Amino acid sequence: MPFTLGQRWISDTESELGLGTVVAMDARTVTLLFPSTGENRLYARSDSPVTRVMFNPGDTITSHEGWQLHIDEVKEENGLLVYVGTRLDTEETNVTLREVLLDSKLVFSKPQDRLFAGQIDRMDRFALRYRARKFQSEQYRMPYSGLRGQRTNLIPHQLNIAHDVGRRHAPRVLLADEVGLGKTIEAGMILHQQLLSGAAERVLIIVPETLQHQWLVEMLRRFNLRFALFDDERYTEAQHDAYNPFETEQLVICSLDFARRNKQRLEHLCDAEWDLLVVDEAHHLVWSTDAPSREYMAIEQLAERVPGVLLLTATPEQLGMESHFARLRLLDPNRFHDFEQFVEEQKNYRPVADAVAMLLAGNKLSNDELNRLGDLIGEQDIEPLLQAANSDRDDAQAARDELVSMLMDRHGTSRVLFRNTRNGVKGFPKRELHTVKLPLPTQYQTAIKVSGIMGARKSAEDRARDMLYPEQIYQEFEGDTGTWWNFDPRVEWLMGYLTSHRSQKVLVICTKATTALQLEQVLREREGIRAAVFHEGMSIIERDRAAAWFAEEDTGAQVLLCSEIGSEGRNFQFASNLVMFDLPFNPDLLEQRIGRLDRIGQAHDIQIHVPYLEKTAQSVLVRWYHEGLDAFEHTCPTGRAIYDSAYASLINYLAAPEETDGFDDLIKSCREQHEALKAQLEQGRDRLLEIHSNGGEKAQQLAQSIEEQDDDTNLIAFAMNLFDIVGINQDDRGDNLIVLTPSDHMLVPDFPGLPEDGCTITFERDVALSREDAQFITWEHPLIRNGLDLILSGDTGSSTISLLKNKALPVGTLLVELVYVVEAQAPKQLQLNRFLPPTPVRMLLDKNGNNLAAQVEFETFNRQLSAVNRHTGSKLVNAVQQDVHAILQLGETQIEKSARALIDNARREADEKLSGELSRLEALRAVNPNIRDDELAAIDSNRQQVLESLNQAGWRLDALRLIVVTHQ
């Protein structure tokens, strides 16, 4: 190579050194100084891995003093280059800049600059970059983006709610599905969509203290969302890092008690500028017009400051009208400000629900019914649709569906309230009750008699509570020496049941923590049964460990012994056997116990075992629950109301279980009440709301579409290609499981999302659901998203050279493959990627500017090419540099038309979609006051900003490949 002192060269292998200067040479070696790092390198003159840096007219260069020069002419004097042009800061012309005075920190970012500077990538990296661009663009355009990446079953009603709410601006909704239908998963799906799209960045989740860790684990395991758990200790710690500790994290979980206990803490929470607030178990927030609770007021303060609010709560029927109104008031205090007015409005929705019932029944409608429908909808041109719906034509069903949809839009709370019921959702198991009547031991009989004498002055309620738990009465008299478990027949029955069902998981629930602990000891010592314990005396982490041990298939605990707290919020639907060692005092707690297993996703019928002692309060209560309420084998929404009305009578029978006169009449009366109330609830069911929440056929299609996406083979091929090139080791373990571990030669020292000790992954949803240790890889998983960012945010694969062996073309024929990206810059919350994600436009040009890309598909062409080493590649580039410049000029003239077409289409789509949504909501505002003014204003503002950003859209060259034809 012809070297001269003062020339500027760049290292092919260490481009991070910047521009080097030739400072010494002899017959065999040359020394380069790299001023930006102060390092020297000694190279062999004959075969050094360096490339001469030469700029061309039209380029802009920077001097070591920082000013820039636009090159008009390049001269050579004694082997050194002199650049002549216009200085940009002073606009002075004919300014000269010798190459020795160039800025040494020069970084080549444009693909063509990298190519001409000898920074040539491996061919497979170019292919990976193009695929990454292509797939990323396609994924952004998917209509259900944000719904595919979660580790959950594809359950239509959950997907429907998440799809509807997740796309809204700052959604404020009440999720009030019946127990077991997956409100937590719905909330997680909504969060996932909002965070992925950029609609939200900061999220606060407030839950009961006992559920904090469950939410933390669910958000991470199911949605790959890493929340920070704030308690007193974490809050104090974070005060050292920021004035407002909550600003140290983007995603935060804390307990309701933690939030309301300290005034300054609540102020910090309110000031932390959250985008979304999620409140679980919101029915525990006590409110009345005159005296709202401190908890309610704390959430009210937050809800006033946070744009998006999701409240997870019990069903409106369970809450009662006033409590239901209190939740809606948190979402929109302007709309829900008068309880009496709200009650009146709810009555007025009855005709709407009746109209929907008529349409769904499929019967012909009378003229009166048609007129009523027309009045309810209030559209001028509704007549043809009504006629079609009432005809025998092929489009009759479509017309009925359209009318139902129009009625839904006008329904009072359908935009803010979602409520699915078990009646409207398929997939629930049966519940089978097995009662086991056992004799009352003499030890208990004696203890009960003595207790009756000593506690004669106790209230009936206290005596009733005592009688439900005879082991507690016995233990009180005997003290520490009492060993009730040695003679209680329920213990013998339980051990027999567990030993005869060794392969089955069994959940045992009892009221007291002491009972659970004593049972664990007996089972372990007598029969060697592996039993985990779960009670309120354990820390949250200890409870999580117990639940995880129970969940392990092979080496886990056979039985989980829970105190009553175990029936609040924890789900164990992988088990189907429930033993109630005793009975809870009210039907709500009974339903909570059964609800731990009776959830959507439960694969087996639930076997409910109730061993009870005869002649005790247990024998009274088991009959009342089963015969009076049918509460064991079916959910019982009437339970609380009947319990309240029958309370006094029931308490007396529980306090004196041997006196059964009239008890059969009480059971009969309660059963009649139950049937009547149930019929009343059924009649009052808001079917319109259920249809809206359930999603019907639309939700089924959504689930099916996502299921089809699960089979995307492009993802597997791309992921393996990505892991190979990044340098991540892959070990196929069979059963659709792959173990990924970092290697010593990765593109980056720490690949974001990959733990130091590696992780197990699967591309199969079913495997991910059955193996909690395996991560479910989709296009939305952080490993893939981080991999895409790693490749596309840098210059990996942006310039390369390949050889094409093709005897049909003359040797030395040049082709240049150009990948342009059409894109618009905008804040993430505008979600511009819905309309114009960074979109690759591929061109394959010959020296005459003919674009062969349409005839030559990328993957087919890529397989015909072979790689060139960097040294040979640099020589080739130098030889054909002028020709490549000319082809690049031709590419620049051709890209404009394609890019403009993409931008115009994106503008048209954005305008149609956002204007259409705005017009629809503005029209509905007249008939449905639940459409918020701020939501309309946000859509209008969003539309204007989106269109303005698309007006500013442009394009740039992202990658290029030089192809030279050879016959060898």
Curated annotation (Swiss-Prot):
Q: Which InterPro entries does the record match to this protein?
A: Helicase_ATP-bd, Helicase_C-like, Helicase_RapA, P-loop_NTPase, RapA_C, SNF2-like_sf, SNF2/RAD54-like_C, SNF2_N
Which PROSITE patterns does the protein's record reference?
A: HELICASE_ATP_BIND_1 (PS51192), HELICASE_CTER (PS51194)
Disulfide connectivity for this sequence is none
* CDD domains noted in UniProt: DEXDc_RapA, SF2_C_SNF
> Which positions does UniProt annotate for ATP binding?
177-184
**GO MF annotation list:** ATP binding; DNA binding; helicase activity; hydrolase activity, acting on acid anhydrides
The catalytic activity of this protein is classed by the Enzyme Commission as 3.6.4.-
Could you tell me the Gene Ontology terms of the biological process aspect for this record?
A: regulation of DNA-templated transcription
Q: Which residues form the Helicase ATP-binding domain?
A: 164-334
Domain (Helicase C-terminal): residue spans on this chain = 490-685
Class in the EC hierarchy, top level? hydrolase
Question: Which keywords fit this entry according to its UniProt record?
Answer: Activator, ATP-binding, DNA-binding, Helicase, Hydrolase, Nucleotide-binding, Transcription, Transcription regulation
Q: Which family is this protein grouped under?
A: Belongs to the SNF2/RAD54 helicase family. RapA subfamily.
Q: What does this protein do?
A: Transcription regulator that activates transcription by stimulating RNA polymerase (RNAP) recycling in case of stress conditions such as supercoiled DNA or high salt concentrations. Probably acts by releasing the RNAP, when it is trapped or immobilized on tightly supercoiled DNA. Does not activate transcription on linear DNA. Probably not involved in DNA repair.
What's the subunit arrangement here? Interacts with the RNAP. Has a higher affinity for the core RNAP than for the holoenzyme. Its ATPase activity is stimulated by binding to RNAP.
Q: What is this protein called?
A: RNA polymerase-associated protein RapA
Q: Gene encoding this polypeptide?
A: rapA
